[in-house]
From Swiss-Prot:
The chain crosses the membrane at residues 13-33, 40-60, 63-83, 107-127, 137-157. Disulfide bonds: none annotated. Its EC number is 2.7.-.-. One of its GO terms (biological process) is lipopolysaccharide core region biosynthetic process. GO terms for molecular function: phosphotransferase activity, phosphate group as acceptor. It is a multi-pass membrane protein. PANTHER family: INNER MEMBRANE PROTEIN (PTHR30443), PHOSPHOETHANOLAMINE TRANSFERASE OPGE-RELATED (PTHR30443:SF4). Keywords: Cell membrane, Membrane, Transferase, Transmembrane, Transmembrane helix. CDD domains: LptA. Belongs to the phosphoethanolamine transferase family. This is Putative phosphoethanolamine transferase HI_1005.
Amino acid sequence: MMFGKKIIHSKTIWFYFLLFLFSIFTNMGLGNVLSENIPVSDYAILFVITAISFYFTPWLGRILITVLFLSALFYCSAGFFYGIPSLGIIASVYETNINETLEYYTTIPFWIFLFQASYFILFVALMKLSFHVKQQAFKWLNTAVISLLLVFSYNQFSDWNYGYKFRFYPVLFYSEFDRMNDLYLEQRDFLNQSANAPSQWDIQSFMPKYKNYILIIGESMRKDYMSLYGFPLKTTPFLERVKGTVFENYYSAAPNTQPSLQLTLYRAEKGETVYTDNIISLAKKAGVKTYWISNQGKIGEFDTIASRIGQSADETIFMKPLGYNSKKVYDDEMLPVLDKALKENISNSKLIVIHLIGSHPAFCERLPYEVKNYFINQSMSCYLESIKYTDQFLEKLNSQLVAQNEPYSVIYFSDHGLAHYEDSNGLSLHPNNLYKQDYEIPFIMFSSDSQKVEKIKTPQSAFNFVYGFADWMGIKEKHLQGVDFFHPEKQEIKVFDWNNVVNVKELADDPAKLPETVQ
């Protein structure tokens, strides 16, 4: 009889030990891992909640840990890198198609899968043990454990009066997920409503200098891996020799595509986006024929900020219709589409926006040829090669414009940068919000009448791009006064880090890696 009680006692101890391990794994999977100083109570409070649920009825406990397990299992690949849910993460959930999702999983470090496997084994063991622990055991141990842990967890509850941002995990995860989801849906509804609404643009004059205006939106290109900006390997030979204007200190508005392009391509008023007023609606208001050529995909019901603007253009060409196409489409395949747009015989000026897939992870998938490992590893070699490929694309595009024999001007910028991280294959890059280099991007303008290279050293922000766009197009508009984009004044550069607008100087540094020959 005593032997049987010892077995029950042993199983009870093991159950609570595994339950505490489960609370640690769950907190980590739900994004509570990025803090520099995570108190024990962050893990203990979840242990308290689950223990209480088993105290009332084991079935309630099993349901609770199952919900927590599934949430953390599926979120951990984002949670380890980005923390609690943000607007950028929610937008990615809605706006990522199946092909992009599969590509995303190929970039996940192997240790994430090891974590998921360990977490799954822990969950199964915990569930099995829960059927062998008597409810009386739950009661006597809960009384002692919960009393002790509530003391350690007091600081969690003390934050409740400060709104949604109390640090009570996992409630914080679900409350933030719900809040960000509502915010995203609200913004999406605004965009849908504004699609057919009249713009607020008030154009005072329009004096175009060129026949063809080409705006090229790049993807995930850090400027410090471009030889144009001093990287020792030749990654941008065309951009280095073309005459035009180069911003040496240009910053994206945000660290990933959706918020970055929203803050770049739309007009803002008192810090709020005016969803009817974007670069396409401005050009159309001026009588310019507009084209949108995209290799990013038209996602369908939950299409991106960029594709919504694109669909409002006079001519819209998505290389990946409806956003799901397993066939790889390379950026070069847009050049024949561009040629057709250039040859369309109209009297008005044209605005042709080209949205590249560029250097989007996974980098090797963006290239129509195999890449030898010549810089650190395969991933980093492909990243450099994707920059070369974009440079070659720009050179071919310029040749097409020259052959057209019409005045033209081209602007190229990237939507955001990337940050270094380590995976099972070594060093690579992915979107992040913690470093200056997540926002430090190239901006180049070259035209048919450019005579020299002009370098602008004064920092400029993509928050001001719409002012520069109007100036570039020769449009004088009532709301776009007071900012001389191409002759910037000294200013503090702010960026949106998914949660707040912060000074870029306050961010950490993540410099480019150099070849061994120049280290």
